[in-house]
């Protein structure tokens, strides 16, 4: 919407969100499958036949829940209070489970933090990990991605913006969310130290420590609580991510593509069922693709690496998202060039090495580059070396994205609609109110707008929305009266809740 409500930009951003979310959902599938394998002492979690694969059934269940909770209504901005309450509850469950586990391991299996860390000091692996934790490029890259992910991940944006019902909620989240993260971080080092101490032989993967530790202590209740906490966390994250991405894909790609088909009946009376059906099919497709991604590289990549891969993809939205709020000069072409360049480098420098590690692509490409061209090696693209290979890919992709966004925006001009939208987003409230008071000479009536909206949302919902608008504005809306520019803009925003800003326009 900020960059002129362009269909091509909306479609490309939706594709970036889809591809970037696939590793994120695959991460949750692997986490659940790994947890189940630890509980059942199964050593092979990724090469099982389809109908014997735990992750396959987890994907089916999560797809069903996402369809059930996220596609009951066509209005994308209608708040899913039940879904948000469920996510809030699972957040408390996983925090309770993690804190209980940390306390039990620290004071139940060991004699406190001092005893635990003293025993762990003799472990060479822990010494190596701690020795590497300086304030170098890798740490700054991970911290940057973590900050950007809280805003740019589709599920984060959906919960923070779309599902936000009160402005004061954002003020509360400013201090409550950091406290929540600090509570989780408190026992991270003790649990890692306990795992390295008890499983010094390396026969247990670090990803499985949280379940392996209570199992080693023969604590059935804590093992079950930890598994429930992890499963509930994965379920909540997958459902919200799938719903958010399905809305983007259906609104910006599927529905516009259907409207362009010659055989598609554009005069149909009710598009509401079509929109819901498109979203439900999209949710199933997203979970299927995430499962395929999990099968492709899940066995060869750690949970943390998969998560950071998704964070880096979502970070490509940051220049356009943050710049669009504070810099009026930023335009559509700058976003398109910047995101294309940044996403291409992400795919080449971060996704390709993961696929090479999974034996999907030739191993010699990692150091020697495709066709033996060394400066095309994904871990040192263009001969640049910024920290490790992950830091190199993150910094290069974000840096090129930001540079292209600023440079192209500076050397190209904005369209009229872009200048108007920039003022709406950047300027003060007073400027917003005066910038849209331009003349309207169309012959469209209020009744015409209602008929259009009823195709997608139904007569009852449309009537209620227009009545609410008339009550707020203090102006009666008669079906036969000519629609003002304010009513036109209200209708566009109303349709955007179903079709997205670009399609509604």
Positions of predicted regions on the chain:
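Membrane-embedded helix-loop-helix hairpins and adjacent transmembrane boundary segments
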Residues: 1-483
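N-terminal membrane insertion elements
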Residues: 486-492, 499, 503-505
């Amino acid at each position: 919407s900020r960059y002129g409500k362009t269909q091509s930009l909306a479609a490309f951003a939706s594709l970036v969100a889809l591809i970037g979310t696939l590793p994120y959902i695959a991460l949750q599938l692997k986490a659940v499958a790994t947890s189940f394998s630890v509980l059942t002492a199964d050593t092979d979690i990724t090469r099982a036949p389809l109908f014997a694969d735990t992750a396959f059934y987890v994907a089916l269940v999560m797809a069903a829940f996402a369809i059930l909770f996220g596609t009951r209504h066509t209005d994308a901005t209608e708040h899913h209070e039940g879904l948000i309450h469920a996510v809030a509850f699972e957040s408390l469950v996983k925090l309770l489970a993690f804190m209980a586990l940390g306390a039990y391991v620290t004071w139940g299996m060991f004699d406190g933090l001092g005893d635990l860390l003293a025993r762990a000091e003799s472990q060479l692996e822990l010494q190596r990990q701690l020795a590497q934790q300086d304030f170098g490029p890798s740490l700054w890259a991970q911290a940057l991605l973590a900050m950007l992910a809280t805003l740019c991940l589709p599920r984060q944006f959906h919960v923070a913006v779309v599902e936000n019902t009160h402005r004061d909620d954002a003020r509360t989240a400013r201090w409550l969310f950091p406290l929540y993260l600090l509570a989780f971080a408190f026992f991270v080092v003790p649990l890692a130290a306990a795992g390295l101490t008890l499983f010094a032989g390396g026969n247990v993967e670090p990803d499985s420590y949280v379940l392996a530790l209570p199992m080693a202590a023969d604590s059935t209740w804590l093992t079950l609580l930890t598994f429930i906490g992890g499963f509930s966390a994965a379920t909540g994250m997958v459902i919200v991510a799938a719903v958010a991405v399905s809305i983007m894909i259906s609104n910006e790609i599927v529905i516009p593509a259907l409207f362009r088909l010659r055989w598609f009946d554009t005069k149909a009376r009710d598009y509401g069922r079509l929109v819901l059906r498109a979203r439900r099919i999209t949710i199933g497709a997203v979970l299927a693709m995430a499962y395929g991604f999990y099968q492709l590289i899940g066995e060869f990549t750690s949970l943390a690496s998969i998560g950071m891969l998704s964070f880096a993809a979502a970070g490509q939205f940051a220049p356009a998202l943050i710049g669009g709020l504070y810099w009026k000069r930023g335009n559509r072409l700058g976003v398109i060039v910047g995101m294309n360049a940044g996403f291409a480098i992400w795919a080449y420098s971060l996704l390709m090495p993961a696929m090479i590690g999974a034996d999907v692509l030739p191993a010699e490409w990692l150091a020697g580059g495709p066709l033996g061209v060394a400066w095309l090696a994904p871990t040192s693209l263009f001969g640049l070396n910024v920290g490790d290979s992950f830091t190199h890919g993150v910094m290069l992709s974000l840096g090129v994205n930001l540079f292209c966004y600023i440079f192209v925006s500076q050397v190209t001009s904005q369209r009229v609609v872009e200048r108007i939208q920039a003022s709406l987003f950047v300027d003060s409230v007073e400027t917003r109110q005066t910038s849209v008071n331009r003349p309207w000479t169309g012959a469209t009536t209020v009744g015409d707008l209602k008929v259009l909206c009823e195709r997608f949302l139904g007569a009852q919902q449309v009537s209620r929305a227009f009545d609410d608008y008339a009550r707020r504005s203090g102006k009666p809306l008669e079906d036969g009266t000519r629609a003002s520019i304010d009513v036109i803009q209200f209708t566009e925003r109303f349709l955007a809740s179903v079709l997205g800003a670009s399609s509604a326009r």
